[in-house]
């Protein structure tokens, strides 16, 4: 086998590794605030608010105006392109607001899922064209990490070998391009919770998908110490009649990761996948209490599971902004504890216990 040319210098590797470690420092995770305009339409319609650029800005301001309490539990915030260039009411760019708290800025760079021909309704993700130039610009504009989401689903015939391979290679190409531009890639192969499959089936599929992803990352000479993984937790399908405990979910999840994710990866930042806010916190907590050795930081990269209570409290009213921000801070602190295995549960019925599941979820 020919020797691979060193794609990254020692300085580039150190920068990437330092960024990744900062994001997943003990007790810290990621706020995923990278919903597309279409996804924001769904969120805002739930509270009867029109999906305008100004309303999206006002909502993001609710999250980003959180005080210094979030510094200890949020290591990074993922922005959508529009948000990266928006400002708060005082004319301060959101990027600067976040950076001044010592939190790193990330950017969603994929362009959404598209059908994968020759499969049973499976998809790949587009956005590689022009990615090199976009990454260079985003780095100049303050982004230190990026996110790219691929989607797989479980059914009798899926995921197919073709879909697994194609999505693994797309993620690897994206990761390589990011690293060349000093941006840490978050690799997100999401296995949707749609279906009635049990925990074992999800664990089996998760292992096959992650094994393919890390083979592709190796083939593309991606520097693992300068990456993060954003997987689904191993959970039963949403329509599965069997209910599993957080401890069972934790054991299946950590087992799948131990079989597939190299210890060189600094951190695993789970997506919430339509779990309720409380469920996502309890499961993350159980994962961090799991008796199996865990060489990576195991933390959160939550969107809906950090925002649902805040969105309900805000309802598009300026007068509610302060209360909504408090709801977000409260949830962020709870997940910061869960990322250390120190969360005891909120006992919260209400909004925090509401399922956030969306069938066939697209961003």
From Swiss-Prot:
Q: Which residues carry this modification: N6-acetyllysine?
A: 111
Q: Which InterPro entries match?
A: Aldolase_I_AS, Aldolase_TIM, FBA_I
Q: Which GO terms describe its biological process?
A: animal organ regeneration; epithelial cell differentiation; fructose 1,6-bisphosphate metabolic process; gluconeogenesis; glycolytic process; response to hypoxia
| Phosphoserine modifications at | 36, 39, 45
Marked site (Necessary for preference for fructose 1,6-bisphosphate over fructose 1-phosphate) residue numbers? 363
| List of residues binding substrate | 56, 147
Domain of life, per UniProt, equals Eukaryota
Phosphotyrosine: residues carrying this PTM: 5
EC number, UniProt record:
4.1.2.13
Known pathway: Carbohydrate degradation; glycolysis; D-glyceraldehyde 3-phosphate and glycerone phosphate from D-glucose: step 4/4
Catalyses: beta-D-fructose 1,6-bisphosphate = D-glyceraldehyde 3-phosphate + dihydroxyacetone phosphate
List GO molecular-function terms, semicolon-separated.
cytoskeletal protein binding; fructose-bisphosphate aldolase activity; identical protein binding; protein-containing complex binding
Indicate the residues that form the catalytic site: 188 (proton acceptor), 230 (schiff-base intermediate with dihydroxyacetone-p)
This protein's GO CC annotations: axon; cytosol; postsynaptic cytosol
Q: Which UniProt keywords apply?
A: Acetylation, Glycolysis, Lyase, Phosphoprotein, Schiff base
Question: In which tissues is this gene expressed?
Answer: High expression in the adult brain.
- Look up keyword Lyase and say if it applies: yes
Q: How does it assemble?
A: Homotetramer. Interacts with ATP6V1E1.
Further information: In vertebrates, three forms of this ubiquitous glycolytic enzyme are found, aldolase A in muscle, aldolase B in liver and aldolase C in brain.
* Family, similarity comment: Belongs to the class I fructose-bisphosphate aldolase family.
What name does this protein carry? Fructose-bisphosphate aldolase C
From the broadest rank down, the organism's phylogenetic lineage runs:
Eukaryota, Metazoa, Chordata, Craniata, Vertebrata
